[in-house]
Amino acid sequence: MKMMGYQNQVLRIDLRNQTASVEPLRMDFAEKYVGSKGLAIRYMYEELKPGIDPLGPDNKLFLTTGPLTGTPVPCSGKLSVAAKSPATGTMNDCSIGGHAGIRIKFAGYDMIIFENIAESPCYVIIEDDEVEFVDASDLWGKGSHETEAILAEKYGIEYSIMSIGPAGENMSNMACINSDYYRQAGRGGIGAVMGSKKMKAILIKGTKGVKVPDIKKATDRILEILHDNVLQEDNTFIYDVGTTAFLEACNDGGIMPWKNFSDTTDVQWTEYNGDVLIQHREGKRGCGSCGLGCGNFLKIGDAICEGPEYETISVAGPNAGIRDPYSIVKFNMVADDVGLDTISAGDTIIWAMEMTEKGIHDFGIKFGDGEGMIRLLKEMGNRTGVGADLADGVKIASEKFGGTDFAMQVKGLEYPQYEPRGSWGMSLSYAISDRGACHLRSYA
């Protein structure tokens, strides 16, 4: 049975044999596990055997859409990216903005499943019914920003491009997948899974669209919801300053971490808040099917990024004892390009700062060292120098060097930037979340 809202097709790609096949979507799954996350988790449960190596050929990479993806329904454009996590050893799903999810749906698929490991570095082009495998040897070793720029120039901007940086290639447990330049599937080492498959990038283009039973009625209702519930004065701050607005609320509420969660507020938070950062705005954009458009492009000197979001501001700012906007934006830019999750990479570097200051082990960095954070990001992504000891996260590093008491992680996934002692709901979420310490399983 085909339900409206689904394309009723799954694209299965075998990277080792460079083949692609199309099969019907399991509608019994779609009916019971509504939405991209539910569908991804159910397919993982069905297809991944217990005990498999997350970086081995038996793990699979799932790109999953929901029944509303491709429609104008607000916030329906996100894509779930899922696999067994090398960081936690459990099921892991990430949510990524941009336009990749919509283009997958427009290409005619509800889900894409990548299997096995390519014999050599490659990228995959998906355009409606056509799938092409292309040698990526010339891209291997390049950062995500350069990779996506090269591919966009070669194939055009009609494609969504998902890519990994050196961290994914080197299978860091905190490697992310970038998409459309500045959006990430960040947590749990999802980029390491893509790197383990020797897949540098995925290009997606779709021209088929989606079907809605009564498009006029649906559009009228969507516009009504947007007007009455989204485009209201209480929400316009998101358009103006994005999630930087959370700084004030978190600081006032005593849940913004300072120096590796040793304190919960910073009296000088206005030195790097949204009002300060927005002075450096160069442009804006929104993700597909979003009525607000929170994305801000900032440029300070040679540092440019989309954002930075609250999490990155906190982990590259107060939690590291830093109040310099340039250092925060630079950290964001380099982490994205190297292909590292800003939360996990930042928390791990912050732990190294405390280790050094307490004299347990000298990692050559202390609180307040913004330049040192940039240096370590590059080393972690390439597994060189001190970064080689930090590339797999704070759990593994602390088990080797000590300092487990202040290694902020659950199940191997580093803490997001909400002080759990100031929020019981968030504390519980960190403790019991299926993917480890996660702010998206609570109220955030």
Predicted features by range, described:
Residues A152-Y155, Y159-M162, P166-G188, M194-A444:
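Extended C-terminal regions of large enzymes
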Residues M1-T236, D240-W269:
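Protein-protein interaction/assembly regions in multi-subunit complexes
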